[in-house]
Amino acid sequence: SNEEMRKAFAPYSLHADAQIYFPTKSNTGDAHIMAMQAGGVMQKNDNHAATVHLEAGAGSYGFLHVNANGERFMNEDVNTQSKSCSKELQPHGIAWTVYDSNWTQDVKKQVDGNLAGGLFYGQMWQPWGNGWNVEIEKASQAQHIKDGKVVVADTLDELAQKMGVPVEALKATVTRYNELAAKGHDDDFGKRPELLTPIQKGPFYAGRLVS
């Protein structure tokens, strides 16, 4: 919660979209400050490696990830922290996960098959012991659409415009991704074939990755 100390000792953490500590206004580095005031010095080594997560929900799915240029930039089959780091290194720190109307079946298949793809297995307000619930996820996505974190469109042209990415670039990226899905092998980034879900049937969605 001390931005000045973060700038000095953990500058990478400043790339995150939001910084949240619980309880709020704690973790201010008071003990470090008192030690330095008493003559101590911070250990001279590399900067603290901040752990940055993705926000749960529509932005954590393991579908096609594109940057602000409409280009794929990573193997989406990684943990949420790796996704955050890759996303933050993209132009303007912007990235989206793009998928189609089959998303609920695809995500449930990933959860039931223990495939992950970086998504969060649990759901907010999920009763202990209950499985992943499609209706809860639909409600979560609806809220994300309302909040502007997810955009939806009937065509890829319209989706690209709502995302603010080059239309032709996004369409070319989706075409290439669908080719890899049909082939069953990710020649570009090595993603597992089980997670290569094609993007073919509208409406189409894009969830903003938030770290």
Cite the ranges covered by each PLM segment.
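Extracytoplasmic/secreted proteins, especially bacterial periplasmic and envelope-associated proteins
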Residues: 30, 158, 169-172
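Glycine-rich loop(s) and the adjacent beta-strand/alpha-helix scaffold that form part
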Residues: 1-52
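An anion/pyrophosphate-binding glycine-rich loop and adjacent beta-alpha core
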Residues: 32, 41-159
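Short Gly/Pro-enriched turn/cap motifs at secondary-structure boundaries
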Residues: 22-24, 52-56, 87-88, 196, ...
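Helix N-cap / loop-to-helix initiation motif
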Residues: 41, 164-169
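Residues at alpha-helix termini
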Residues: 37, 161-162
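A glycine-rich dinucleotide-binding beta-alpha-beta segment and adjacent secondary-structure elements
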Residues: 169-211
